[in-house]
């Protein structure tokens, strides 16, 4: 069962485990574990997506319990009225508190976007980021005798595909576990020495105005075991008090094989 973070007559939010698809895709026809179908079976009613999380990303996923609720939520996301907060573990020491305004060329899928235009101009992409902590571990990576990691808080102000992953790669601080935009040697080292066998990106919090009641709504998602073990090993416990926890549900024991 998935962990339900919030539910009322109009909305439901769950803590999406890493490795789970949000909805079925013809690109992954054999995938049996899908968030939308699992939530539908769990609560006994249909759900309607308003946003998405990449397969390897964990955290808050908010859905409507009717097509109208889904539409209103989607409109808020599209108009950037919903504040999103993520946390990531990255390569190196990133301690800036800054905003990156770096346009991104649309990332196309070789199959799904086979017939899409190839001459589209880069799209505006803005990310606010803040370094929270750093650590240097006595583990060699490549030609270096030690390995450095950073804990970063991220708030995307736009919603481009893989925006956070691509922006951090642009800053030369790729997210650990990112097999597409990251550092493969760092990924292997983190997996071998610190059991970070997934993309270390977590959607920690959504802050919005409820689309039906007009009341402020904050939804937060706890970290899974992989994250908590990393925080412990790096001496970062207590830095994310709203998301840290000790006990875990079965659903939080995510499939660590999906890192793409």
Swiss-Prot record:
Keyword Acetylation set for record: no
GO molecular function: pseudouridine synthase activity; RNA binding; tRNA pseudouridine(65) synthase activity
One GO term of the biological process aspect: enzyme-directed rRNA pseudouridine synthesis
InterPro entries reported for this sequence: PsdUridine_synth_cat_dom_sf, PsdUridine_synth_RluA-like_CS, PsdUridine_synth_RsuA/RluA, RluA_PseudoU_synthase
EC number annotated for this UniProt entry: 5.4.99.26
PANTHER family reported in the protein's UniProt record: MITOCHONDRIAL RNA PSEUDOURIDINE SYNTHASE, TRNA PSEUDOURIDINE SYNTHASE C
Function: Responsible for synthesis of pseudouridine from uracil-65 in transfer RNAs.
NCBIfam families referenced in this protein's UniProt entry, alphabetically: PRK11112.1
Identification of the protein by name: tRNA pseudouridine synthase C
């Amino acid at each position: 069962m998935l962990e339900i973070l919030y539910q009322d007559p109009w909305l439901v939010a769950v803590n999406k485990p890493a490795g789970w698809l949000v909805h079925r895709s013809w690109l992954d026809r054999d995938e049996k574990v899908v968030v939308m179908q699992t939530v539908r079976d769990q609560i006994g009613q249909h759900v309607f997506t308003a946003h998405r999380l990449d397969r390897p990303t964990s955290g808050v996923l908010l859905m409507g319990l009717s097509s109208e609720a889904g539409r209103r939520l989607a409109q808020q996301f599209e108009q950037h009225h919903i504040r999103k907060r993520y946390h990531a573990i990255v390569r190196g020491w990133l301690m800036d508190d800054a905003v990156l305004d770096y346009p991104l060329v649309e990332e196309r899928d070789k199959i799904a976007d086979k017939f899409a235009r190839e001459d589209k101009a880069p799209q505006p992409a803005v990310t606010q980021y803040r370094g929270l902590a750093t650590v240097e571990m006595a583990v060699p990576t490549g030609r270096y005798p030690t390995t450095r990691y950073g804990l970063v808080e991220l708030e995307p102000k736009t919603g481009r595909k893989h925006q956070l992953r691509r922006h951090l790669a642009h800053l030369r601080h790729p997210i650990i576990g990112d097999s597409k935009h990251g550092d493969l040697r760092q990924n292997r080292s983190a997996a071998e020495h610190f059991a970070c066998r997934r993309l270390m990106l977590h959607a920690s919090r959504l802050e919005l105005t409820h689309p039906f009641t007009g009341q402020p709504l904050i939804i937060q998602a706890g970290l899974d075991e992989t994250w908590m073990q990393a925080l412990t090993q790096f001496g970062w416990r207590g830095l994310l008090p709203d998301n840290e926890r000790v006990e875990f549900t079965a659903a939080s024991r995510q499939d660590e094989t999906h890192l793409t």
